[in-house]
Amino acid sequence: MNLMEINACILEELMDKKIILCVNVKGYFQELDKKYHVLNRVAFVVDNYDRKQGYTECEGYRFPVYSFDYLNNINIDDYLILITSEYYEEVYRQIKGMFPDHINTTIYHYADARIHYYNYFSNKFKEKPLENKIIFCSGAKKAYNIESGEFDDNSLALFEYMLENKLNMTYQLVWVVLHPEKYTQKYSQYENVYFLPYRWSESKDTNERRTYYENICLAKYFFFTQATDIATHRREGQIRVQLWHGQGIKSRALFTHDEYRYEYMTVMSEKYGDLHAEIFGLRQDQILVTGNPKQDWLYHPLDKRIFDVLGIPKADKYVFWLPTMRDSKTEVLSDDSINSDTGLSILEDECQLDRVNEQLRQSNMVLVIKRHPFEKCNTHMVKTYSNIVILDNTMLSDRNIHINRLLGYADALISDYSSAAIDYMLLDRPIAFAIPDLDAYKSSRKLHFDNLGEWLPGIQITTESQFCDFIKEVRDGVDSGKKLRQNAFKKLGKWRDDNNCKRVLEALHII
């Protein structure tokens, strides 16, 4: 077998053959049809993910979607097999592994604009040595045009650590973002720091395209939090590191086999290393047990004057609540849906919030609720309560504030399924888990642990009364969940320090 990029001449030459598309990616189908008008020739689609099988529709066409095993039922020489994925080499390996070595069929792949340009420039720069250049990226795929989280999380923590330790004098530090102008001024005093517009990856301007791919093709290291689309392919010697968002109690919604999508993934402990190797399809030697860079922020919170900027009043004690915020109109429980007038679990109506607010007022305590990034803002909740402050994602992202930069001031934390609770566990302070919908949530989202109570680093609360009791415990300095937290740390944790960034860079021999 061999792999070749499809083009108009090949499609015309093989006009008599029906097409099999691998894999089910509608965006690729649309682009493919716009360029070559071939969807009318498609026989079926193959995809190994169960949730993508069945049928798919695109541009008025409806195709059956089978697993890859279906290819064993046909004579593949009768078809034109066309890979529709940015990870076309990975898909090709899967297909090739299904057939004997003597099969001499050519497998084709469609290259979108970014892949086409990358292939061109990687060939152009292949004789140039790699440079002391590190690329950073954070958040969802830039192709989705989602700004939220694009300059944040573990990638940002590692970047700022490198600046603090003057590693920008050894390496060029380059961020791929949607809007460089938002960040350029803040870091203008640093040498060798650049912000590269993602749009240049498909720019019509030759110089912009060249600049973008010269950085991508010659960088030694890539660090990303979540999406890997800036480095779906690499040349020999380049190292891609998946920092992810952290480790929590919920698993991934969709398994992907990431073994060839990056070289390493960082985790906070051996237990999470085993879990992530399984759910990301990685080898054990790809797991770096270093701790998560953003956990260092817990030990170095921002100047407390930021509370004035965020409208957080002075108090004797602060309890932070990081709920998985939910939409009251959605029936299926997930990361962004729950039946509640307030969008909160447990405190589901304003009367309950009134009672909790009064308890906080009498105790000179403040409850800080940090919204889920995708939750719509209920501004009346912000204005109504004297001792309850609600922070939405925009308030923080506009000021480049990650929640871990504030949690160092939290005397206690209330969470549910967020990885922030596992981060906060390192500070060894009280944690409560507001999970009244546990059974329903498990039916919609897989968790790492079946016997969850044995793994949680804190007590479980399911009612308003228990919520208020936890507030009282914090007020009185009672820590009823201490043993639970200690037991959980023994199983899930490893370090309680601010050296995670350092360990990541040491593991990669950057320092």
Predicted region positions:
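Hydrophobic, well-ordered beta-alpha structural blocks that scaffold small-molecule cofactor pockets
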Residues: M1-K124
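Active-site and donor-binding regions of nucleotide-sugar-utilizing enzymes
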Residues: K26-G27, K133-H300
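Active-site donor-nucleotide binding/catalytic segment of nucleotide-sugar enzymes
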Residues: S122-N123, E127-N154, K304-K376
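Catalytic donor nucleotide-activated moiety binding site of glycosyltransferases and closely related
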Residues: Q172-V193, L322, R326, L353-L396
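Donor nucleotide-activated moiety binding/catalytic core segment of transferases
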Residues: P197-W200, K204-A219, P373-I422
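A donor-sugar binding/catalytic signature common to diverse glycosyltransferases
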Residues: K220-Q247, D398-R445
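A nucleotide-sugar donor-handling region in carbohydrate enzymes
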Residues: I249-A253, Y260-L344, P373, S480-N487
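Catalytic binding pocket for nucleotide-activated donors in carbohydrate/polymer assembly enzymes
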Residues: T384-S386, D392, Y417-L492
